[in-house]
Amino acid sequence: MGQKINPIGLRLGVNRTWDSRWYADSGEYGRLLHEDLSIRLYVLEELKQAAISKVIIERPHKKCRVTIYSARPGLIIGKKGADIEKLRRKLSEMTNAETSLNIVEIHKPEIDATIIAQSIAQQLERRVAFRRAMKRAVQSAMRLGAEGIRINCSGRLGGAEIARMEWYREGRVPLHTLRSDVDYGTAEAKTAYGICGVKVWVFKGEILEYDPIASERRSVEIDHSGSSSNRRRENA
């Protein structure tokens, strides 16, 4: 089962938690769900170059709090915060509520599955050889502390007549073990020959205690220098 299911969905409530954190009555649930989908789609399309890993949406009473995890926060914030203010106003219009925006910097994008998948997809669109792109990503992840990584590329790779799937793995990626911290990300490369899919699994170690936000804590943990490894920019 672990081979087929989304590793993040399998671990929800164990060492992962939801990216949308709010409660709504049945009458409001559908509208808020579609709002969340629209917000994520807009942010990912508008900030394609900002290497966004995930967008977390929380809804305190009649408000909306959006947290964006990005490897390039400067592209989101803009000169003197002009771009982030423009984005905040747009999100306020979409939600019809007072919206605050937090930007969290990812200091090790080389071991973030979503960012790795996006990077490989962009390379495929630039006609970089898929094996070279996969191998480079695997080597970078293992060098920066990943315990294992697997990458799948599928489609008309290299312009081949028949679509196929190629994969590359290094280290171990235990998909059945619930205590393992496995990050998972996907991306699509729109090439001249059609769409190629990219899937990435990154094993970052084991989380032994029960903690639904343990994986999130790891992404904002203190670095070796003693200072916070993630920089936050808050705009209310």
Curated annotation (Swiss-Prot):
<dbReference type="GO" id="GO:0022627">
    <property type="term" value="C:cytosolic small ribosomal subunit"/>
</dbReference>
<dbReference type="InterPro" id="IPR036419">
    <property type="entry name" value="Ribosomal_S3_C_sf"/>
</dbReference>
<dbReference type="InterPro" id="IPR004044">
    <property type="entry name" value="KH_dom_type_2"/>
</dbReference>
<dbReference type="GO" id="GO:0003735">
    <property type="term" value="F:structural constituent of ribosome"/>
</dbReference>
<comment type="similarity">
    <text>Belongs to the universal ribosomal protein uS3 family.</text>
</comment>
<feature type="domain" description="KH type-2">
    <location>
        <begin position="39"/>
        <end position="107"/>
    </location>
</feature>
<keyword id="KW-0699">rRNA-binding</keyword>
<dbReference type="InterPro" id="IPR009019">
    <property type="entry name" value="KH_sf_prok-type"/>
</dbReference>
<dbReference type="GO" id="GO:0019843">
    <property type="term" value="F:rRNA binding"/>
</dbReference>
<keyword id="KW-0687">Ribonucleoprotein</keyword>
<dbReference type="InterPro" id="IPR015946">
    <property type="entry name" value="KH_dom-like_a/b"/>
</dbReference>
<dbReference type="InterPro" id="IPR004087">
    <property type="entry name" value="KH_dom"/>
</dbReference>
<protein>
    <recommendedName>
        <fullName>Small ribosomal subunit protein uS3</fullName>
    </recommendedName>
</protein>
<dbReference type="Pfam" id="PF00189">
    <property type="entry name" value="Ribosomal_S3_C"/>
</dbReference>
<keyword id="KW-0694">RNA-binding</keyword>
<comment type="subunit">
    <text>Part of the 30S ribosomal subunit. Forms a tight complex with proteins S10 and S14.</text>
</comment>
<dbReference type="Pfam" id="PF07650">
    <property type="entry name" value="KH_2"/>
</dbReference>
<dbReference type="GO" id="GO:0006412">
    <property type="term" value="P:translation"/>
</dbReference>
<dbReference type="GO" id="GO:0003729">
    <property type="term" value="F:mRNA binding"/>
</dbReference>
<comment type="function">
    <text>Binds the lower part of the 30S subunit head. Binds mRNA in the 70S ribosome, positioning it for translation.</text>
</comment>
<keyword id="KW-0689">Ribosomal protein</keyword>
<dbReference type="InterPro" id="IPR018280">
    <property type="entry name" value="Ribosomal_uS3_CS"/>
</dbReference>
<dbReference type="InterPro" id="IPR005704">
    <property type="entry name" value="Ribosomal_uS3_bac-typ"/>
</dbReference>
<dbReference type="InterPro" id="IPR001351">
    <property type="entry name" value="Ribosomal_uS3_C"/>
</dbReference>
